[in-house]
Structures are given as C-alpha cells and as structure tokens.
C-alpha cells in the first residue's frame, strides 16, 4: 500500500509538472486559437534599406546571430510543448523566411498576405485583403503559424509584438492574445 501511494504521488507530480510546462496549450484553448502570428526574429534596424529588392536578401534587413538563436529557441519551445502546425506560412521577406527555416519545425511556404506594407513596397489594402480571405477560410480545427511583420500583426490583432513575439488568434471571433514565452520558459 505504501508503494502504491508513492507511485500515485509520483505520477501525480509528473502529470502536474507536464501540464504546468505547457501553458501555451492552455492559452490556445482559452480562445480556441487557430492561428499563431509570430513577428520575425530579431533583425536589427528599422524598415528596409533604400535599395530594397524582394528578390535579393542582401538588400533587406536580415536576422543577426541573436535573431537566428531567437528563431531556433522559439522552434524548440514549440517542439518541447508538442505544438504541431497544420501549415506554416511566411512573408516573402527574407527575415521571415529565415525565421521559419531556423525554427526547424516543418516545411513552410510564402504567402503575399503576410508581406510588410510599412514602407510602401506592397499595397496595404491588397495584403490585408488576401490575409483576411485566408483567415476567413481557415478551419477552426487547424493551427497555422504565420510569420510576418509588426505592422501586419498589429493591423489584424491590434497588438504590436516585439521581434520573435507571438500572438494567439481565433480567426472566427477575432480574439487575440499575446503569449510571452519569457513568462513560461527560463531559457529565453
């Protein structure tokens, strides 16, 4: 009987520890999020250089070493918490594509509806229209990661995340909630 009690206590502790280490799942469930918006990882600077060319990464603001590490850490956080995405989409900007690659959590594809309209390189209304069509047609049972820019996330959610920041979003009722990994994972 003593061993049975010890085993029950042990399993109870393991179960509680596992559950406590996955607050992102609780937060996703709270709002029935089917989208996780992520701002691209750290890419020092502001906007893009004057010679910006979407087809040339050298003409863009790119991830630095800290940004690469940040993207890898976010990817590890998702893996550790067993977050599986039905789709991973990225802006066509190199810093967003590279964020997806460095996260190493699955294949990603680019989507024009996530491109930055900050400096007028693309038309804001075209981007938001494409994104809204995509969001309106998502299944409530899916979970899609969208790696994009501060201006796009703020336009949809009214929240401005930092580099590498995560916003949970329910595309059906338009509920958004910021999730700060640093509040839950001491490795950040």
Across the structure, where does each feature detected by a protein language model lie?
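Sec-dependent N-terminal signal peptides
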Residues: 4-14
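...with weaker cross-activation on analogous glycine-rich loops/strands in unrelated enzymes
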Residues: 134-137
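Active-site-proximal alpha-helix that buttresses catalytic centers in soluble enzyme cores
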Residues: 21-120, 139, 159-188
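Short, surface-exposed amphipathic charged segments that create phosphate/polyanion-binding patches used
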Residues: 122-129
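Active-site regions of oxyanion-processing enzymes, predominantly non-cytosolic
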Residues: 140-141, 145
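Short, well-ordered beta-to-alpha junction loops that form the rim of enzyme active sites
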Residues: 90-93, 147-151
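Sec/Tat signal peptide C-region and signal peptidase I cleavage site
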Residues: 14-20
